[in-house]
Amino acid sequence: MTRKFLIPTENQEQRALVKWLSLHPLLKEYFYKNNNEGKRTEAQTWNLKLMGLRPGVSDLFIPYPSKTKLYAGLWLEVKRNMHYPPSARKSETWINQEIWIERMKGVGFDGHFCYGWEDGKRIIECYLSA
């Protein structure tokens, strides 16, 4: 019998990263999740857009400056820890996420895609020492 190891979902990866952040002595009070995803009716989507919903906004934001004050905060887009084919990276959603991160980098923030919660943890630890 062959055992199949499942790759955790994006939701599971983000929950694991949030759990780690919730225990972090410095950052536990300095992060939040952007509620940009989900299935909505046309009316809900329209209403949220009127309220400021923007495509591509990253999943997590840590509004805490890096050690050297080089960055004012860190934006993280959480992805599953798996290989993504080039076609997936060309989707409208992915492109909007890349645009958001580049836009934020242009105004004093840092931003990254992380592939699994452990990659997110590594990025955050590097950010804190920058």
Which residues does each predicted region cover?
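Catalytic phosphate/metal-binding cores of nucleic-acid and nucleotide-processing enzymes, i.e., regions
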Residues: M1-A130
